[in-house]
Design a protein with these regions (language model features):
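A position-specific signal in ABC ATPase nucleotide-binding domains
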Residues: 17-18, 25, 69
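Conserved ABC transporter NBD signature motif
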Residues: 22-33
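Non-catalytic connector elements of ABC transporters
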Residues: 212-293
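C-terminal boundary and immediately downstream tail of ABC-type ATPase nucleotide-binding domains
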Residues: 187-209, 231
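Helix-to-loop junction immediately C-terminal to a conserved catalytic motif
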Residues: 14
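ABC ATPase nucleotide-binding domains
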Residues: 44-46, 54, 59-193
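ABC ATPase nucleotide-binding domain helices that frame the ATP-binding cleft
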Residues: 7-10, 106
Length: 293
């Protein structure tokens, strides 16, 4: 979420900023503390910036080779990276002659070239259109796995975080409030903040007695007693058209691959369901619902 400290965390890891307190470890070695500060050039960390930060006066080849020694260039590392990133045909072009996706590929190649132990990516796909972002995202994951390089990616994109990362950490006010696999984050969020950060759940107020919690959408099993917030994902709600149904469709938003239906109960409370577009729902339709736990 915005302002939580994600980009600042990357800059601290890279060594671009010094923390006021605490310590940072890499390879079980302290690289930043009250007494130790390893400079950026000695951390073996690569960085891919949101705005690419390519050198406009250098062509692709020189941008990528910027962090390489003459020996590494002579040993073919430059050509290897150009081929790996599908940039052989662009090596003599300048950044302003490239598309946004090509520029980002060059930025990634420059970060990979020296063989860093960690690559930091600061919202690397936000300036690209949806199709290009997905395509480049897949390429980045492939390259990172191929080179066996650890990466830390900062993103606001929920789909990007869940599809790219092995471990997702959700930050709030500079603190990690949950760090787990994408599946665990999505299915078992530890708080409403986490639930909202990876989807658009329906948050229902309820009160649980003897392991059963009553909500506006029915009764569910609970591991706890007392007042609770119950999170129900829109895709867990199945709708059925019924002229005598208990719920009223207010709006249907079509996305192509699926649709989001807003509906309300007799009290006027509004909820969201997500379904395949094979059934058409219109405002005013009566429906019944079934929720999969």
């Amino acid at each position: 979420m915005s302002g939580s400290g994600k980009t600042t965390a990357l800059r601290l890891i890279a060594g671009f900023e010094k923390p006021d307190s605490g310590l940072i470890e890499m390879r079980n070695e302290i690289i930043s503390s009250d007494k130790v500060f390893v400079p950026p050039e000695d951390r073996n960390v690569g960085m891919v910036f949101q705005d690419y930060a390519l050198f406009p006066h250098l062509d692709v080849e020189k941008n990528i080779s910027f962090g390489l020694s003459k020996n590494e260039i002579n040993e073919g590392r430059l050509e290897e990276v150009l081929e790996m990133c599908n940039l052989e045909n662009y090596k003599n072009k300048y950044p302003q002659e490239l598309s946004g996706g090509q520029q980002q590929r060059v930025a990634l190649a420059r970060a990979i070239a020296p063989g860093p132990e960690v690559i930091l990516l600061d919202e690397p796909f936000t300036s690209l259109d949806a199709h290009m972002a997905r395509e480049l995202r897949d390429e980045v994951v492939y390259l990172l796995r191929k080179t066996e390089t650890t990466a830390i990616i900062v993103t606001h994109d929920q789909e990007e975080a869940l599809s790219v990362c092995d471990v997702v950490s959700v930050l709030e006010n500079g603190k990690v409030i949950q760090s787990a696999t994408p599946q665990e984050i999505y299915l078992n969020p530890v708080s409403q903040t986490v639930a909202n950060s990876v989807g658009d759940p329906n948050i229902l107020k309820g009160y649980s007695v003897n392991g059963r919690v009553e909500t506006s959408l029915g009764t569910f099993v609970s591991a706890y007693d007392g007042a609770l917030d119950v999170s129900i994902r829109p895709e867990c709600i199945e709708l059925t058209l019924d002229s005598d149904g208990s719920y009223l469709v207010k709006e249907c938003t079509f996305y192509g691959h699926d649709q989001v239906i807003s509906f309300q109960n007799s009290k006027g409370e509004v909820f969201r369901a997500r379904s395949l577009p094979n059934t058409i729902y219109e405002a005013g339709d009566r429906i019944n619902i079934e929720i999969s736990e």
